[in-house]
Every structure is written in structure tokens, then in C-alpha cells.
Amino acid sequence: MESMFAIIAKELGVKPGQVESAVTLLDEGNTVPFIARYRKEVTGELQDEQLRTIEERIKYLRNLEARRQEIINAIMEQEKMTDELMASLMKAVKLQELEDLYLPYRPKKRTRAMIARERGLEPLAEMIVNDTVTSGNSLDIAKEYISEEVPTPEDAIQGASDIVAEIVSDSADFRATLRKRMWKEGFIQAELVEDNEHKDQFLQYNEYAEPVRQMPSHRILAVNRGEKLGALKLALTVPDESYIQYMVHGITKNEQSIFSDVKASAVADAYKRLIFPALERDIRNELTESADEQAIKVFGVNLKNLLLQPPLAGHVIMGLDPGYRTGCKMAIIDAQGNVLDYGAYYLTNSEKLKQEAQKKLAEKIRKFNVTLLSIGNGTASYETEQFASKMIEEEKLDCHYIITNEAGASVYSASKLAIDELPDLDVTIRGAVSIARRVQDPLAESVKIDPKSIGVGQYQHDVNQKQLTHTLDQVVESVVNHVGVELNTASPAILQHIAGISGTVAKNIVAFRQENGGFTSRKQLLKVPRLGPAAFTQCAGFLRLNGAKNPLDNTSVHPESYELAERIIGELGFTLKDLQDKSQLEALQVKLPLVDVDKMAHKLDAGVPTVRDIIAALAKPGRDPREDLPAPLTRKHVVSLEDIKVGTVVKGTVHNVVDFGAFIDFGLKTNGLLHRSELCKAKQHPSDVLAVGDIIEAEIISVDVKRNRIGLSVKSLRNKDKKKA
């Protein structure tokens, strides 16, 4: 049997030794971000995603092995183990295979077959199964089994048939074959429930059928939702008679048996009563699990790209949380995120109130030198955008606006964290502050919100919530550690996502900072309560200290590699102090790209990946990797439905990526749908081509005013470019 390491290595296309090293590091309590960044030599430079897959797969395979041993022990206790069964158990590579093999030996509730055995009908059942009787009358033979509990020959045959049905149902071979055939030949069929209040949402699925093997995840989740709401009836349809005949043929030893018809009926009963319901349930569950996995993956990719949006630093920002009845809440923050002013204004009511609001807000924009308006994308967003565009034009203001994803802002504004951060502000104003800060530093603000509330997925409320939470937490952890955080300004909300730091330790770090006037070196982390050497090893490299005594504290170089970093600097004719001298640092940065990494690593007896990473860190101390990405799209003018028509080319921001395409915000109230057929090749997923936050140009190919739908295409633009060329 292949080792677990070999199995995972084959799946990932890496070497078994890499997997073994990664598992050893994980078992020792190291975190994925730490291993990915600082143990590259040990793992052969395995990436974050690969390490997480290894973590999940080794857990599954260990559970599989534990279950295998449980089953072997249980069967041995029953003294029913055979060499053939043992071989099959040892070959099983899925939990489902093990459970199928264990089914005949699993303790059962009192079944019809059990009752029949208790009544002495097992010998009759064996005659039926083994086809040993080829002459005489079946009822005459059955008479021999009449008793007080079995009053008639027909009752005897029925009881024996129940035993036969259970034998057939318990066959791992039959179940495995039928399961494969159902996946290959089955259809999911949907039927609309006419008197259901939700039926209008699912009209497209009335009398709908699709092959099991071809159903995309978003369609599986859609029909599942319809079933859950009682609007759809779902069923798995397969060639039942073909399957029954296959099993009858498989269990027949002699076609001349007088019990042939009895056996055929027992097989049909086994299929309809026991096998099909179980396999239908298995297949539906597998479909749902697969769809959940895909939806969660898409959500994770979208969340990652959203969190990696570059910060719009240096702006004084006015956050606008739109609303109708209670008005639009406004908050102005400075370049450090501190609240300068706030209030509520009516931007969507009477013309008089709108004019008053315009004058007052324009006055504040000039007073505080606001350069950017951040408008939440919820209720009344489009009307607020129209107001902002008109105000900027009429008041001749030197600022732009941006539409910001406000999902989760209301949840955050009422949270304990928001109360602690903004104790003097009303709950409604806190939402406006959050909308402003999300533009200033999307990562720092978004980590304060439950990732599930951010709203960049598909069917996120329908999928396995435990798995969704687990995956999204991993995404947040990966992004936060990839970017790194400033130790002296980071909130507990973001610190708790750093490798090795818990929520309690994050609060202790902030408390230490407040009591001691801030950190001056990474080493001081060891003085923080409950942050010991092991946690320090995990977290230190991801925490930056601008202005620290040791300039390496403001880089991604891990303290364990400081000595190596100094030697590299020395080899180039510089000292550590030169990193704090602008002209010397610039001179060093000219030399760094010219270094032969392999030679340097060999000379210093160090790992090539570590030397490469140290050189990259020295080249850009304190670098924020988000700065390399294109800045978000800001606007001065609103787009109206009258401005667009088929053939218009628009520029917009990718708001969400799903299995069937992407939704693009190009300044209209409704996001345009860029269907995958108008975006990418057949086998590509939209997320292979686009990411949340990307700025793209697309052509409008359809406008449905009645249904409020706009269709977009990038393929048409490519085709036009080809013709021009």
C-alpha cells in the first residue's frame, strides 16, 4: 500500500519527501504562513495553497487509516475476517469504500432480515441465493419452514426473500458498480411545486433535467435551495430495470432454479427499498459537497483579491453611508483614519433638502481638504452617487468618488469592536467611518468583519457553514501574513490573524504598546504576556516596526536570519546602519539586483531561497506588496441608463466572480454580467481570467431595461482588435 506521503505527493505533483517534511513541520505546531515563508529549504519551496492541501489531506488519510483499523478490529471480533476481505479493506482509498465493505458486518437496527433469521428462515434463503434446487414446487419446500411465527409457505418465502434482499444490498461490489453507473448515467430531475410562494424564483427549473456528471456547482446549489424552500421536487433518475437485471444476473448461479422468480423479486426489493435510496442520498450528498467546495473556493479567491486591494493612502476621505428615510450618514477621516467630522444629510428627498446638503457637504470638503468620497453600495447608493457627481461638478470640487462594498458595515458598527474603537459615535455613524476606512486600508478594515458578511461569493448562505468559516479564516490569515502588519499601529482585529498570535495575545500586544509607549524592537514581543519563544518564532517575521533600532525589524527578514542578512550586506561593502541612511541604502539597492544568489548562498553556506528572500526584503524595506497592484477606479461623473446602448464600451471594476461569469460595476445602478462564454475559453474558470478589484474594459452586448439586466463581453473587443490588426 502506498504511503500517505506518496499519495499526497502524486495528487500535488511534488516529491514524497517534500510532503513528509511539511507534515513534520505541521505536526510540530508550525503555522502554514511561517512554513511557506521561512522553511522553504525544508519543504522544497511549497506554496501556501499546497501546504493547506497537505494539511487537509493528511488529516483525511489519517482519519481513513484510523477508521480502517476500527473496521478490521470490529470484523475480527465477530470472527468473520477472510483473506479476501482483508485485502479489499487494505486497498480501500476512500471512506465510502470502507463503509461499503463494512456494511454486512455493521451492527444494525432490528431489520426484516434479522427477524426472518430469528424465525429459522436462513436455510431457505441460502437455497434461493445458491440456486441449489432445480425441481419440485417452491411452496412445498417452503412448507417445511412453517411455524407459529411463520404460519404459511408464502410467509416463509417472504421472510427468506427479506434475507436475500439484505444480502444483495450489503454487497460492496454491487454498490460500487451501481454508484459508478449512476454517476455516469443518472440525471437530476426537477419539478416545480405550483402552490409554493417561492416558485417564481425557480421557473427556469420546471421539468428540468441534467446529467449528474455535468451539473455545475452553481446549478446544484440553486436547485438545492429550491428544494429547501419547497419550490422544487428533486429526484435522481436512472435506468432502474437495467440495474436490477444486472444484479439478478450477477447473483444467478443456475437459471433452472425453481426460486428464480423469487430471487428476481428479492433483488428488485433490495434495489428499490435499500440500495437506490442509499445511493441516491450518497450521490446527492456528494454533489452538494462538491458544489459547496467549489462555491467556497470561489468565495475564498474573491475574498483574497478583495483583501489585497491596494490602499488609497494619503487621502482625506468622506465616507457616505446612503439611506432614504433616515438620511445619508457622513464621516470624514484624515490620512491616518482619525475621525474629523460626521453628520447626517438628506440627499434623496426634496430638492430643497438636497440643495442644503450640497452646500453643507461642499463646505466641509473644502474645509478638511477632502480628496475622495467613498460611497457605500447598499440602499440608495445610486441616488447618492448621482448627488455626489452633481455636487462635484456644480461646486467645482477637486475630488473624485468611489463606490465601496459596504457589506457587513452595519454588523461591524454594532459590534463590541466598533464600540471600543469609536465609543463616542452613534452606531449609524460608525458605518460611515467603516466605509471611509475600507478605501484607506481595505485589509485593516475588512478583517474587523465576519468574512461571510463581505458578500463576494455565490450561494454562501447555502453551503457548509463550518467549512466556509474555516476556509475564509485561512484566506484572511494568508493575506494578513503575506502583507505583514505594523506592530505599533495594528488593531487587535488584524493582529489576531498573524501566525502564532491568538485573540488574547493580540489584546496583550496592544496593552503592552499602550503601557510602554510602543515597541522599539521585535525582541520586546517576548515581554508580552502569553507570547513565548514558540509564538515569537511564528509571528516575528510578519510584524514590521517602522523606525526600529534595528532596521531589519521593518523588513520581512526573520530574526533567526538577521546574522545572515548582515553578512550579505557586508559582502556588498555595507553595514546594517547603512539601511538607515538614505543615500547608502540607495547605493545598496543598486547592487542587490546584481547579486548571484546561488554563489552568495554557497559562499555563506545558506539556503538559496532564504538568501533570495533576504535580498528582496533589503531591496524594498517596509514594502507593502499591495502597492504593486493597480489602484481602484475613481469617478467624477455618474453613468445613466440613457448613456449606454449595445456597442458602448465601458470601463469598470470587477465586483464579484462566480462560476458562470463576473459582475462588473461600471457606474450604473445595476452591475453588468460578463458571462463566462463572453470572457474565457470553455475549460477556463472566470477566476482564472479575472479577480475582484480588476479594472477592465468591456462592450455592452445586451440591455434589458424591464429585467434590469446588462450583458457585457470582452471577446467582442478582442475580435475587433484582431480585425484591426
Give each language-model segment a name.
Residues 4, 56, 62-80, 90, ...:
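Long, highly charged, low-complexity intrinsically disordered interaction regions
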Residues 15-16, 28-29, 95, 121, ...:
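Short flexible coil/turn linkers enriched for glycine and charged/polar residues
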Residues 38-40, 129, 239, 322, ...:
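Short, ordered loop/turn segments at secondary-structure junctions
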Residues 50-53, 60, 64, 69-74, ...:
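Duplex nucleic acid-engaging cores and interfaces of nucleic-acid transaction enzymes
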Residues 74, 88, 98-101, 226-239, ...:
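Structured, non-catalytic alpha/beta "coupling" segments that mediate domain-domain communication
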Residues 180-188, 320-324, 378-380, 404-411, ...:
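A glycine-rich phosphate-binding loop feature that marks nucleotide/adenosyl-phosphate handling sites
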Residues 317-319, 329, 387-388, 521-524, ...:
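Short beta-alpha junctions and helix-cap segments that line functional grooves
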Residues 548-549, 553-725:
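Single-stranded RNA-binding regions, centering on S1/OB-family and related RNA-binding modules
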